[in-house]
């Protein structure tokens, strides 16, 4: 072999490796939990959820005041006080004790898990009531981590967990943005996603680091949710209709790179007023085109299903930021975030009651 060719061989191999990594992206990781050995199957609870939601919209409320309800916010907690506050007020008007966990979305999963554990203990010791947790987005991952890591301390204090649009298995957006060694046009695609997500979460892009497939696989190898814990998973997909992408509002802003003209050397940046819904729709469309996966703009439906959980798969188009902006523009013809949370927690209580009955039948 020519010496120069031999010298260039490692560089060529690295280039091939980078090209393969770029092209495949997250294709081999999406839905990995569904094929992982030893994972328990899920159960479809969509029909029962819809029945409970309809009853709630007709004024029938079943959540007991013998529990404390802890809401755990996720990546959009930086959008201010509207996030989960309306749901807390909604619960309070029904005479229910409801708290919102004070965690920072940009903190690591392990750090937030510790803080959630301490929050649950404080609530329990102050009330002597069991706690039901509902986490949205990364908040669901953080809450699940708390119960996985500290179950021996929390098993007599926690009655169940709901994960709403949570990337329990990981997120292709997180993995694709943070993956190194990408080439060509995919770098521009990555940059577009990064611009959208950075503006949407209003924080450090490293907040996504613990949500990459690599990080989630590492974590779940060490910690898994206890089998006796009642768990409900809820996931949706975003609407990517043209009118959603075209909608403008004041909620979030993005600077989108404009393709330079022939006479211009540098691409111009134009500030574009972009609502959360449009940013999520844009991300959902990118993921649909690249991977053929239905997502809420951040999380694929398959990655949001926790093994062994009762899964709710509504047909209604809801993106990942819906919990935030539903407080701003509720459609009276549809259930709002507070009602959805109530229905999910009611379903969780039913799941827990059924599990306890099954255990007692076995013991009997």
Which stretches of residues belong to each language-model region?
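Flexible, membrane-associating and regulatory peripheral segments of lipid-active enzymes
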Residues: 1-84, 89, 93-94, 353-364
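Short coil/turn segments at beta-strand junctions that form active-site/ligand-binding loops
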Residues: 67, 127-131, 229
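Glycine-rich His-Gly loop
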Residues: 72-75, 137, 166, 236
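Acidic-and-aromatic substrate-binding clefts and catalytic sites of carbohydrate-active enzymes
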Residues: 77-81, 104-111
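Short aromatic-enriched loop/helix-cap "lid" or pocket-rim segments at secondary-structure transitions
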Residues: 83, 170-177, 242-247
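Conserved alpha/beta-hydrolase
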Residues: 86-106, 162
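Serine-dependent carboxylesterase/thioesterase catalytic core
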Residues: 113-221, 296
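C-terminal catalytic-base region of ester-bond hydrolases, centering on the histidine
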Residues: 226-364
């Amino acid at each position: 072999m020519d010496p120069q060719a031999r010298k260039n061989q490692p560089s060529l191999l690295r280039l091939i490796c980078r090209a393969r990594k770029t092209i495949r992206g997250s294709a081999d990781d999406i839905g990995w939990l569904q094929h992982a050995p030893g994972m328990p199957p899920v159960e479809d609870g969509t029909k029962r959820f819809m029945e409970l939601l309809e009853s709630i919209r007709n004024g029938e409320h079943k959540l007991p005041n013998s529990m404390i309800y802890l809401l755990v916010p996720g990546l959009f907690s930086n959008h201010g006080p509207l996030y989960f506050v309306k749901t807390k007020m909604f619960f309070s008007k029904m005479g229910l004790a409801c708290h919102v966990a004070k965690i920072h979305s940009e903190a690591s999963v392990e750090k937030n898990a510790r803080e959630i554990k301490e929050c649950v203990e404080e609530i329990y010791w102050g009330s002597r009531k069991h706690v039901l947790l509902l986490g949205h987005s990364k908040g669901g991952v953080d809450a699940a981590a708390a119960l996985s890591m500290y179950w021996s301390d929390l098993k007599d204090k926690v009655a169940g967990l709901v994960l709403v649009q949570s990337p329990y298995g990981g997120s292709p957006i997180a993995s694709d943005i943070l993956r190194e060694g990408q080439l060509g046009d995919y770098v521009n695609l990555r940059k577009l996603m990064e611009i959208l997500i950075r503006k949407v979460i209003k924080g450090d892009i490293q907040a996504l680091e613990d949500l990459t497939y690599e990080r989630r696989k590492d974590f779940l190898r060490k910690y898994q949710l206890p089998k006796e814990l009642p768990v409900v998973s809820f996931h949706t997909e975003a609407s990517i209709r043209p009118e959603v992408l075209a909608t403008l509002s004041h909620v979030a802003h993005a600077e989108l790179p404009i393709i330079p003209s022939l006479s211009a050397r540098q691409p111009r940046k134009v500030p574009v007023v972009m609502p959360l819904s449009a940013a999520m729709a844009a991300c959902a469309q990118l993921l649909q085109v690249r991977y053929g996966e239905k997502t809420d703009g951040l999380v694929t439906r398959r990655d949001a299903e926790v093994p062994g959980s009762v899964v709710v798969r509504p047909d209604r188009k809801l993106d990942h930021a819906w919990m935030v902006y539903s407080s701003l523009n509720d459609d009276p013809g549809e259930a709002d975030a507070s009602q959805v949370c109530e229905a999910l927690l009611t379903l969780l209580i039913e799941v827990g009651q059924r599990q306890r009955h099954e255990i007692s039948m076995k013991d009997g």
